[in-house]
Regions:
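An active-site-proximal structural segment forming one wall of the substrate-binding cleft
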Residues: 133, 171-191, 206-237, 241-287, ...
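Acidic/histidine-rich helix-loop elements
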Residues: 153-175, 203-209, 257, 373-398
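Surface-exposed binding patches on compact interaction domains or structured appendages
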Residues: 34-35, 57-85
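N-terminal carbohydrate-binding accessory modules
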Residues: 121-190
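A short beta-strand micro-motif common to beta-rich folds, especially ectodomain repeats
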Residues: 95-107
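Bacterial Sec-dependent N-terminal signal peptides
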Residues: 6, 13-41, 105-106, 111-129
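Aromatic-rich peripheral "rim/lid" segments of glycoside hydrolase catalytic domains that contact
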Residues: 429-512
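Active-site region of glycoside hydrolase catalytic domains
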Residues: 259, 263-395, 404-424, 449-452
Length: 512
């Protein structure tokens, strides 16, 4: 019996000596080489990466990470001398983070120290977004300079009542040559002439535009030409909220709808292009206005797999094809191409510029009323870093960021950009008006800084508050409301070349 006990004890000791690292001998040691690792201290960059570690062990060890959510170990087949990988995910924080990896074999333990650097962040200086940008020399900068200070003849030829466009339907008197001469005298250099064609388009398949309306549009364009102004003509409220014939929502819903609407769209643009084929390069065509499904970029376009975006891009291509095919000066005319809803972000993300037989003759058209609760709805009284009383929740930086993104995407690549609409409604007190003036001067100076041509929205409204954006009388060309304060400030913002006058100087002189 005693001999049997000795044999059992000897066998047990032998088994313990060759067992896995997780089992200890009576003396607490294991057979084979001692557990070791190199290096013991790991320092990794903020990006997701791996680092190799050489491990020597008598048998397969266990690995325990103190931060397994971002620091893990990859180990292959065991060998007494092997290589493992310590893996880290991206550290999106600016702060470094630390973890430890324990390598355990029996009662032996080696600890690896893991440090991952934080994401490198360039400290933002308060004046960085106000820095002066050296004007470029490419086509984008050249065209923006040519357009200069723009203005909209809004709520005029785009006005409509019960589905019929009428120049005086929304309260403005008939435009005259004096209107455009007055604009020129005040420093305006370009005019956007929105045109609604509702009620003036005949039946399929010709879709003939009635002569009286077409001739009136041509007459107003002639006013701009005679005054020496650049001009933009478009199809405006025909696509408003997808309520009328130029409905992006219906066109995206079926092939039949798309084909029917596109046929009318092409027919209308063929007639417009032919009417103005002999006009010089002062005239720019813009295919449509703010096309969306009625939800201003927050509707079905977010879930339809890009169907509405594709329609907008396809219509832009059809527009270019039709205009170029009419010949004359249209073969090389500048054409403005809006993205979905004319929203800058949606345009950057989804606009596909049409193929064009004329090189460098396409402009990108976007609108910007940021923040709209201040500029259009008048829910806030003041805006910017100096605002105190009922201030808008966003300030100058987001506005500049919009322009920076447009510059990076388009202007730096030689593609001109213009804000077909921008502005800020009139206010009722002198202090509120001073912030309105500051917003507009800052916005327009930023446009000049980033090489973007801005067109002020003017709807002729002389009251104050929501949607009241009258600065110049649409019939006489004289100032109305506080236009005598606003327009000279915008002229200064766009054309002042004194070194002391900068975006930062405008910022520093905000109302207090």
């Amino acid at each position: 019996m005693k001999t049997l006990k000795h044999k059992i004890l000897a066998t047990a000791v032998m088994l313990m000596a060759v067992s896995a690292c997780g089992k200890e001998s009576n003396s607490g040691s294991v057979t084979g080489p001692a557990l070791s690792a190199s290096p013991l201290e790991l320092v990794l960059e903020s990006a997701a990466s791996s680092q190799e570690v050489n491990v020597t062990a008598p048998s397969k060890p266990n690995f325990v990470s103190s931060a397994s959510d971002w620091c893990t170990v990859t180990a292959g087949a065991f060998a007494q001398k092997s290589v493992i990988k310590v893996n880290v995910t991206e550290n999106q924080s600016a702060e470094e983070r630390k973890a430890s990896v324990s390598i355990v074999c029996g009662d032996e333990r080696v600890r690896l120290s893991v440090t991952q650097k934080g994401r490198e962040v360039t400290p933002e200086q308060p004046e960085d977004f106000l820095a002066e940008i050296e004007p470029g020399t490419n086509n984008a900068w050249t065209v923006a300079k040519k357009l200069g200070l723009g203005w909209n003849l809004g709520n005029q030829l785009d006005a409509q009542n019960n589905g019929v466009a009428s120049e005086t339907a929304w309260g403005n008197a008939t435009a005259t040559q004096a209107t455009f001469d007055g604009l020129k005298a005040k420093g305006i250099t370009a005019v956007r002439i929105p045109v609604t064609w509702l009620g003036h388009i005949g039946a399929a398949p010709e879709y003939k535009i009635d002569d009286a309306w077409m001739n009136r549009v041509a007459e107003v364009v002639g006013y701009a030409e005679k005054a020496g102004l650049m001009a933009i003509v478009n199809i405006h409220h025909d696509g408003a909220d997808s309520k009328y014939w130029l409905s992006v929502k219906r066109a995206a819903s079926s092939s039949a709808e798309y084909q029917a609407i596109t046929a009318e769209f092409k027919a209308v643009w063929k007639q417009i292009a032919e009417k103005f084929a002999d006009k010089g390069d002062f005239l720019i065509f813009e295919p449509f206005n703010e096309l969306h499904d009625g939800s201003w970029g927050w509707g079905d376009n977010m879930t339809d797999g890009g169907a509405q975006y594709r329609v907008v891009n396809q219509w832009a291509q059809e527009f270019v094809n039709v205009v170029r095919a009419t010949g004359g000066n249209n073969a090389s005319r500048y054409l403005g191409i809006p993205g979905y809803c004319t929203n800058p972000d949606l345009t950057i993300e989804n606009l596909v510029l049409p193929k064009d037989s004329a090189e460098g003759k396409l402009l990108v058209a976007v609108h910007c009323y940021d923040p709209h609760d201040y500029t259009l709805e008048a829910k806030y009284d003041e805006w910017g870093h100096a605002a105190v009383n009922n201030p808008a929740p966003s300030d100058e930086k987001p506005v500049v960021e919009v322009m920076r993104k447009l510059k990076t995407k388009y202007i730096d690549n030689g593609i001109p950009v213009y804000f077909g609409e921008c502005g800020c409604v009139n206010r009722s007190t002198s202090r509120q008006t001073s912030f309105q003036k500051y917003y507009l001067e800052f916005f327009f100076r930023a446009c000049r800084n980033y090489g973007i041509a801005p067109f002020l929205w003017d709807n002729g409204a002389m009251d104050t508050g929501r949607e009241t954006s009258g600065f110049i009388n649409h019939s006489t060309g004289e100032y109305i409301a506080n236009g005598a304060q606003i327009i000279p400030a915008l002229k200064n913002a766009m054309f002042n070349t004194e070194k002391s006058y900068t975006l930062k100087s405008v910022y520093d002189n905000a109302p207090r």
